[in-house]
UniProtKB/Swiss-Prot annotation:
Organism ancestry: Bacteria, Pseudomonadati, Pseudomonadota, Betaproteobacteria, Neisseriales
Naturally occurring in which organism (per UniProt): Neisseria gonorrhoeae (strain NCCP11945)
Cystine bridges: none
Gene Ontology biological process terms in this record: ribosomal small subunit assembly; translation
Keyword Transmembrane carried by entry: no
Gene that specifies this protein: rimP
Record protein name field: Ribosome maturation factor RimP
GO CC aspect terms: cytosol
Primary localization: cytoplasm
Stored HAMAP family: RimP
Keywords, ordered alphabetically: Cytoplasm, Ribosome biogenesis
Amino acid sequence: MYIGSSMDIQTILEKTLPGLGYELVDFELAAQGTLRVFIDKEGGITVEDCATVSNHLSRVFMVEDIGYKNLEISSPGLDRPLKKAADFVRFAGQNAKIKTRLPIGGQKNFIGKIEGCENDTVTVSFDGKTVQIELGNIDKARLRPEFKF
């Protein structure tokens, strides 16, 4: 059972992880008391990174009285979620799948290349077209890695 809201947890994670050298990618409160935290850093995440963050967060959550049954620390994976403007800037030139809250030109799902992000507007090119999507209109966005064999 959780003691504290998801906003409390997010605030704690956003204050703690950068001091350890990690970026908070996302977190989720899963069934049966599991708290999953997805972290990243330049060069990727190792098992040792996950252990370091787990040990540190366990202590922080104990002090802050945040209860959970299981704490899982993980990398976001190759298809990591994109949530902030900085994510779209960092991954410009890569492919992504974006689902919007409201349709743009009668379409809510876009798969294309991230061209960039300025003034909280993401530019994506697909099928020879370019579309601009306001961050506030993005419901979900994930990198879509290309595998070349």
